């Protein structure tokens, strides 16, 4: 399946669930304690990361989605640290503070990239606390497209059936990362995402692929779910729906360092993709790719849109050069700048590529290490040049440009001027051919404001696409 990313910035998601703080103490071990046969860790790094439902919300925000987060916290310093952690990425916390309970904290001691011990600081919340949280969250349903219930069995989500029913009645999809042996608590959910252990805790041991599908379809019918996505570690994922064939998605993980938070990443990528307009199979493929990225990181982590673009490109065997999308180019440009490469950018219609174009692009490339050529799509060429243009469709124009040794990346744009795409990419040097004044070059002011430069190059005399077309017409 060829996967493209939807406009994540359009996604509006509410996450409700068990929020917690993941705290890491990190340091070297060089000796065994004289008091007991345990290593002594000299702590030289302390790090706090939002975990549980808060990690789901951060993953959504990192992908570019708009997200609100509802959860139960204590009246303590940990709650303050958690608030700061989620607000850093623009997540709106909607806490319900329970004064006599601590904010859940998971403290991990690490050395040499290995977890030595985990210490949990928590007390289960009361059922009444969950009722109040879900009631408070009802007011947020009108402002979102998807709800995620992130259940870690800590008490935030006790009996959510009425909340799910209300959300579905409002046309809001409800995704659940479940816990426990009673999936009936999530009756009517749009999608649940158990891992294999969680799935078998409910349905019993799975003996074969056919058995998995039969048991999944039984759960769909029993609890009125629209779909079940079973995450299966090295076997990837299996999506089962009521009205379509099952979908098996193989894993794309290259290296596995830590599975902490992988389930959070799956449901956050699903929620963001679905809220942005992706269909369910596409959203599952995106989530599978995101999970493959996050297990290659240590500790509770997030996955960015740029990382997803890179992972999808690698999965599809793409080199990262040639004809690319804007998102692919944004990632490639970021990497080029990290390598210290000077990036030059130009633009045009390039309807019939001629020797003047080739010479101009060679000059442009000589001014830096990499050259981007932004190409007007067919509709914008017609608006600029009139009926009968372009002679060559944009895919063909870009393919020819990508074949030139001087050109590294070719990207289409649909506006009459390249102002928007230049402003997004901000090359080190923007060049334009002809007799332009610097102040009249689209995107030039933005490039200069970002510390870049703008330069005008001359075209070789005697070459013109219009003249070539007229000459062809005259000789017919």
UniProtKB/Swiss-Prot annotation:
NCBIfam families, per this entry? Answer: cyt_tran_rel, PRK11316.1, rfaE_dom_I, rfaE_dom_II
* Protein name from the UniProt record: Bifunctional protein HldE
| InterPro entries referenced in this protein's UniProt entry, alphabetically | Bifunc_HldE, Carboh/pur_kinase_PfkB_CS, Cyt_trans-like, PfkB_dom, RfaE_dom_I, RfaE_dom_II, Ribokinase-like, Rossmann-like_a/b/a_fold
The UniProt entry, under PANTHER family, shows: BIFUNCTIONAL PROTEIN HLDE
Keywords, ordered alphabetically: ATP-binding, Carbohydrate metabolism, Kinase, Multifunctional enzyme, Nucleotide-binding, Nucleotidyltransferase, Transferase
Give a single Pfam family match: PfkB
As one GO molecular function, the record gives: ATP binding
Keyword check for Nucleotide-binding, yes or no: yes
Gene name for this UniProt entry: hldE
As recorded in UniProt, coiled-coil segments are: none
Question: So what does this one do?
Answer: Catalyzes the ADP transfer from ATP to D-glycero-beta-D-manno-heptose 1-phosphate, yielding ADP-D-glycero-beta-D-manno-heptose.
Tell me the subunit arrangement: Homodimer.
Could you tell me the EC number(s) of this protein? 2.7.1.167, 2.7.7.70
Q: Where is the signal peptide?
A: none
Q: Which BP terms does GO give this entry?
A: ADP-L-glycero-beta-D-manno-heptose biosynthetic process
Paired cysteines (S-S):
none
Keyword Acetylation among UniProt keywords: no
Q: Which organism is it from?
A: Shewanella baltica (strain OS185)
Q: Which pathway, per its entry?
A: Nucleotide-sugar biosynthesis; ADP-L-glycero-beta-D-manno-heptose biosynthesis; ADP-L-glycero-beta-D-manno-heptose from D-glycero-beta-D-manno-heptose 7-phosphate: step 1/4; Nucleotide-sugar biosynthesis; ADP-L-glycero-beta-D-manno-heptose biosynthesis; ADP-L-glycero-beta-D-manno-heptose from D-glycero-beta-D-manno-heptose 7-phosphate: step 3/4
Q: Where is this region: Cytidylyltransferase?
A: 345-476
**What are its GO cellular component terms?**
cytosol
Q: Which residues form the active site?
A: 264
**What residues bind ATP, as annotated?**
195-198
Recorded hits in Gene3D superfamilies, A to Z, give:
3.40.1190.20, HUPs (3.40.50.620)
């Amino acid at each position: 399946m060829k996967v493209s990313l939807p406009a994540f910035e359009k996604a509006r998601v509410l996450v409700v669930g068990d929020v917690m703080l993941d705290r890491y103490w990190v340091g070297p071990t060089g000796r065994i304690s004289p008091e007991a046969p345990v290593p002594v860790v000299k702590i030289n790094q302390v790090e706090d990361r939002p975990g549980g439902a808060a990690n789901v919300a951060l993953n959504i925000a990192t992908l570019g989605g708009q997200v609100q987060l509802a959860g139960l916290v204590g009246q303590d310093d940990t709650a303050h640290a958690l608030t700061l952690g989620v607000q850093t990425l623009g997540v709106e916390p909607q806490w319900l503070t329970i004064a006599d309970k601590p904010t859940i904290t998971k403290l991990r001691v690490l050395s040499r990239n290995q977890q030595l011990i985990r210490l949990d600081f928590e007390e289960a919340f009361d059922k009444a606390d969950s009722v109040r949280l879900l009631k408070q969250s009802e007011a947020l349903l009108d402002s979102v497209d998807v709800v995620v219930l992130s259940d870690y069995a800590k008490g935030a989500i006790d009996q959510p059936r009425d909340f799910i029913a209300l959300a579905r009645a409002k046309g809001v999809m409800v995704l659940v990362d479940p816990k426990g042996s009673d999936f009936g608590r999530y009756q009517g959910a749009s999608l649940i995402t158990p891992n294999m252990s969680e799935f078998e805790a409910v349905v019993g041991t799975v003996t074969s692929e056919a058995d998995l599908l039969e048991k999944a379809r039984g759960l769909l019918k029993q609890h009125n779910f629209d779909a079940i996505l079973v995450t299966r570690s090295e076997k990837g994922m299996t999506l089962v729906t009521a009205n379509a064939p099952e979908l098996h998605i193989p894993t794309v993980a290259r290296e596995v360092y830590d599975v902490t938070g992988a389930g959070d990443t799956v449901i956050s990528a699903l929620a963001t993709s679905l809220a942005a307009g992706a269909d369910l199979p596409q959203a599952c493929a995106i989530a599978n790719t995101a999970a493959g990225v996050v297990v290659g990181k240590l500790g509770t982590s997030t996955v960015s849109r740029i990382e997803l673009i890179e992972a999808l490109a690698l999965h599809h065997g793409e080199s990262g050069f040639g004809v690319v999308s804007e998102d692919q180019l944004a990632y490639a440009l970021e990497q080029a700048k990290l390598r210290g490469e000077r990036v030059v950018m130009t633009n045009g219609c390039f309807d019939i590529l001629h020797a003047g174009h080739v010479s101009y692009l060679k000059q442009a490339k000589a001014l830096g290490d990499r050259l981007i050529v932004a190409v007007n799509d067919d509709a914008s060429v017609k608006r600029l040049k009139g009926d009968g243009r372009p002679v060559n469709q944009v895919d063909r124009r870009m393919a020819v440009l990508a074949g030139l040794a001087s050109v590294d990346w070719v990207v289409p744009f649909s506006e009459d001027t390249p102002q928007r795409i230049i402003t997004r990419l901000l090359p080190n040097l923007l060049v334009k051919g002809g007799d332009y004044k610097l102040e009249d070059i689209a995107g030039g002011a933005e490039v200069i404001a970002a510390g870049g430069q703008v330069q005008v190059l001359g075209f070789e005399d005697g070459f013109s696409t219009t003249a070539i077309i007229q000459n062809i017409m005259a000789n017919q």
